[in-house]
């Protein structure tokens, strides 16, 4: 039915594109008018637009003319002009949607249109890229357009200090990576002076490679951590316990969902081993958490696939790029559990000071938009979770790439032999080949096989840097063979015949020019010195030579069929396969793609290889004989759809849990901002006092409506101990006239008198600052502990499913109670401190951070920062158990430690 409707009316994207075409035509109609303006007149348009907005016009009203101004500025500064389809892409982004644009269609240039338009409001625009290299490249490259039009441009890079960051955020348009934007938000909510905050309000973000950031990275929380105090003994103990368990008997593994859980038998073994009655009890949360992480380390995490052990350290392997993530650690104690499993030194668990998922960070922007070459397969997720719809933008020239059907082999060895033969054949005739692999290990295996055959090639697994961009840019040269892990080099176009700009820059390096001079020389902005002016002349000479060379080679490569892309395995997500395919056939060039698959590949092993294997066996097919059929390609796509569905459900499920924490975070951060913004907190403090008194009046009068039966002495003793002066409250009301409200009023009036006295003693101005210092300190300390507790609750909540309770409902209920306890605890500690504080009038008080951040879980790109070394305190047998049960260590987790 849907197919019939689409045939008659066109797909959703086609209808949307048709609807936006008249606006794009209007933009193009300004071309001659803009071309007649001088540079100064074109620049003056920016102020004219700002004034029109002040006078009541909207961004939509000025869009056609503003886009036309950017188009002309791009031509004058970069000799680039937006095509009609790029203008449509720009409109889609301005509307807060996702524009799916194929590789090579100029997404970087498209973003300049909505970025300029939205920056006119003066509230800031963030352009989000996947790595520092692209952020800096795009700021320097596209920044020329904005600066020509009088707007300021900033970039946030990993190693920048707070002052530089603040300046970059104050710019009209700011480039940076998703991680840097997210971490700055967290750091801003840890500062103790408002002036130390670097970000402005989160107004409008354009996310490049939006699928990579909002889907592939969505499950990765950003974590800022400090040094924890917990002992690491518990990890070793949990590891010892897990080694005694039998798979399927004591625990079950769900490979598809990457989850592991104890069976009832396993739970009984845990209770016996740790000497506890009920593992699901709230006081055993810590033990349950450690067991869960040890199970995950043994049953789910595989050495040399998920992590490697190098120089006595466990180093994570990025599942999407195959890179080693130096300085990054798994959170929630999983890293320590793997260290215990591998027998290396178990590093002390860091304490989480602040955390947020990318999903929740980006949902805070007033308006969000994204660009990618592949979003349609995840359209439902973008719509459900972010409220973003996907519009597929047509290509500027028709797509003529040939996508061959998949070829399936029985074994991985046979598959790789076939891949090598294919590469050898293509290389002989000079056709460039790009091979995509799923891991470093597979890249190296293929590289070794090609070396044996004497085929020259480049291997890309390294961390992101300019060298990688250069290799990927030259992957379209005649006879080039490039092996790359899935996402390596994203953001850089592969031009058939080679990229003349990279060739010219390399020649300048060989001639002895510095990188800084080359980068400035290759630009279009004003030159900073005579040296740069001469370098620019030389650069354009070399560029012309390189263009002649690449144009000739381009023709030859086109005749050979263009770039040939080989996929050595199907990824779990069709989108990642489409990204690899999309490297070929850019901007109307010819190209080919083919996937080689074996029944031993992860996807085939988990989903649907049985039927294919039986078919191959029944036909008596040997290892080196492939099968190739469209039906099989369809079956593989079905398997991928199944995995995508599972992964979407997991992300949605995680988001439901994370939403609980997110609401709590918003409340705490909003309160914190009020404190920083210098509000008079006296009224808030007295409200806390009243709230505490009401709460305890309720507790001590519960069970009876008769005042003579109330425990008034117990109530007052408790409040004296907490914050009031001893014996200061006089209740001179007849019992028959006493009710809870009257009792609360009497105590509250005395509490206010005591607070006024304290203020008179210290001085009002000093008292206001003390209120701020105390409240910040208490909120931060309590919030950090609360993050840990919520984390453990989430880890252990699965055990509740045994009691036929929906874990999510139970989690929400307990989390609500815990948050209420947190608020009460903040109130009580704040009031206690303020009533008891002793301050010398002449002393100048200073605010201090509760905990110093020492690391983030994502240290830039391959940034190998040493973690601080922390001296570990040994737990004595009679000390309180580090698991938090309240028992002595020897009676609890130390019962099995000799």
Swiss-Prot record:
SUPFAM superfamilies attached to this UniProt entry: Helical scaffold and wing domains of SecA, P-loop containing nucleoside triphosphate hydrolases, Pre-protein crosslinking domain of SecA
A GO MF term: metal ion binding
Catalysed reactions, semicolon-separated: ATP + H2O + cellular proteinSide 1 = ADP + phosphate + cellular proteinSide 2
Membrane topology of this protein: Peripheral membrane protein
Gene Ontology CC annotations of this record: cell envelope Sec protein transport complex; cytosol; plasma membrane
Job of this protein: Part of the Sec protein translocase complex. Interacts with the SecYEG preprotein conducting channel. Has a central role in coupling the hydrolysis of ATP to the transfer of proteins into and across the cell membrane, serving as an ATP-driven molecular motor driving the stepwise translocation of polypeptide chains across the membrane.
Name used for this protein in its record: Protein translocase subunit SecA
The organism of origin for this protein: Caldanaerobacter subterraneus subsp. tengcongensis (strain DSM 15242 / JCM 11007 / NBRC 100824 / MB4)
């Amino acid at each position: 039915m849907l197919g019939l409707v689409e045939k008659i009316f066109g797909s959703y994207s086609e209808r949307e594109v048709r609807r936006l075409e008249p606006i794009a035509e209007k933009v193009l109609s300004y071309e001659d008018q803009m071309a007649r303006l001088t540079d100064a007149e074109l620049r003056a348009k920016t102020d004219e637009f700002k004034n029109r907005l002040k006078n009541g016009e909207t961004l939509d009203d000025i869009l056609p003319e503003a886009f036309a101004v950017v188009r002309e500025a791009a031509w004058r500064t970069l000799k680039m002009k937006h095509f009609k389809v790029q203008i449509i892409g720009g409109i889609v982004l301005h509307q807060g949607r996702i524009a799916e644009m194929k590789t090579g269609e100029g997404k970087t240039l498209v973003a300049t249109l909505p970025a300029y338009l939205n920056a006119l409001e003066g509230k800031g625009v963030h352009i989000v890229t996947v790595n520092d290299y692209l952020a800096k490249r795009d700021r320097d490259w596209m920044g020329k357009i904005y600066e020509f039009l009088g707007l300021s441009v900033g970039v946030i890079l990993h190693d920048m200090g707070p002052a530089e960051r603040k300046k970059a955020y104050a710019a009209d348009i700011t480039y940076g990576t998703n991680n840097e934007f997210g971490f700055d938000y967290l750091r801003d909510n840890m500062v103790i002076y408002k002036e130390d905050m670097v970000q402005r309000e989160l107004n409008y973000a354009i996310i490049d490679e939006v699928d990579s950031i909002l889907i592939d990275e969505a499950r990765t929380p950003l974590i800022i951590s400090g040094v924890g105090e917990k002992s690491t003994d518990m990890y070793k103990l949990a590891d010892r316990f897990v080694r005694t368990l039998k798979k399927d008997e004591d625990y079950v593994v769900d490979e598809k969902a990457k989850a592991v859980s104890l069976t009832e038998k396993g739970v009984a073994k845990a209770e016996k081993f740790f000497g506890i009655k009920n593992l699901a009890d709230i006081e055993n949360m810590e033990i349950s958490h450690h067991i869960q992480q040890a199970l995950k380390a043994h049953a789910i995490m595989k050495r040399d696939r998920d992590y490697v052990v190098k120089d006595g350290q466990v180093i994570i392997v990025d599942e999407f790029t195959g890179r080693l993530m130096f300085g990054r650690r798994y959170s929630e104690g999983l890293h320590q559990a793997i260290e215990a499993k591998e027998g290396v030194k178990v590093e002390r668990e860091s304490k989480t000071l602040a955390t947020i998922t990318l999903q929740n960070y980006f949902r805070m922007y007033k308006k969000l938009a994204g660009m990618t070459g592949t979003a349609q397969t995840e359209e439902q997720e973008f719509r459900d979770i972010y409220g973003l719809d996907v519009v597929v933008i047509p290509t500027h020239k028709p797509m003529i790439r040939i996508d061959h059907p998949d070829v399936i082999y029985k074994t991985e060895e046979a598959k790789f032999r076939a891949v090598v033969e294919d590469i050898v054949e293509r290389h002989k005739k000079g056709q460039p080949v790009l091979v995509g692999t799923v891991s470093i290990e597979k890249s190296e295996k293929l590289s070794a096989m090609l070396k044996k055959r004497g085929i020259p090639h480049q291997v890309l697994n390294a961390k992101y840097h300019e060298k990688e961009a250069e290799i990927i840019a030259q992957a379209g040269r005649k006879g080039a063979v490039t092996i790359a892990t899935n996402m390596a080099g994203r953001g850089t176009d592969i031009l058939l015949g080679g990229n003349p700009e990279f060739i010219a820059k390399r020649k300048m390096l060989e001639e002895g020019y510095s990188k800084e001079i080359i980068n400035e020389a290759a630009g279009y902005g004003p030159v900073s010195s005579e040296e740069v002016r001469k370098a620019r002349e030389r650069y354009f000479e070399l560029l012309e030579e390189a263009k002649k060379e690449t144009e000739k080679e381009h023709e030859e490569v086109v005749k050979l069929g263009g770039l040939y892309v080989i996929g050595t395995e199907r990824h779990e997500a069709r989108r990642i396969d489409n990204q690899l395919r999309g490297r070929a056939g850019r901007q109307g060039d010819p190209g080919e793609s083919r996937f080689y698959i074996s029944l031993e590949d992860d996807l085939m092993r988990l989903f649907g290889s049985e039927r294919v294997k039986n078919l191959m066996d029944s036909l008596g097919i040997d290892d080196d004989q492939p099968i190739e059929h469209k039906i099989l390609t369809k079956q593989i796509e079905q398997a991928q759809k199944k995995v995508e569905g599972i992964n979407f459900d997991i992300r949605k499920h995680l988001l439901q849990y994370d939403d609980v924490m997110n609401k709590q975070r918003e409340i705490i951060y909003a309160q914190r901002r009020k404190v920083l913004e210098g509000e008079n907190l006296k009224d808030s403090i007295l409200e806390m006092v009243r709230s505490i008194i009401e709460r305890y009046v309720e507790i001590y009068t519960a069970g009876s409506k008769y005042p003579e039966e109330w425990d008034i002495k117990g109530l007052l003793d408790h409040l004296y101990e907490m914050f009031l002066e001893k014996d200061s409250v006089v209740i001179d009301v007849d019992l028959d006239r006493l009710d809870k409200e009257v009792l609360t009023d009497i105590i509250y009036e005395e509490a206010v008198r005591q607070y006024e006295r304290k203020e008179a003693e210290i001085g009002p101005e000093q008292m206001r600052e003390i209120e701020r210092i105390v409240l910040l300190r208490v909120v931060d300390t309590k919030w950090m502990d609360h993050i840990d507790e919520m984390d453990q609750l989430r880890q252990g909540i699965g055990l509740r499913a045994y009691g036929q309770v929906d874990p999510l409902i139970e989690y929400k209920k307990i989390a609500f109670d815990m948050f209420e306890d947190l608020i009460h605890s903040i109130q009580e500690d704040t009031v206690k401190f303020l009533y008891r504080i002793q301050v010398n009038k002449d002393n100048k008080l200073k605010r201090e951070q509760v905990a110093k951040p020492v690391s983030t879980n994502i240290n830039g790109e391959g940034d190998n920062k040493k973690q601080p070394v922390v001296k570990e305190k040994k737990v004595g047998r009679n000390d309180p158990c580090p698991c938090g049960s309240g028992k002595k260590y020897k009676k609890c987790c130390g019962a099995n430690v000799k």
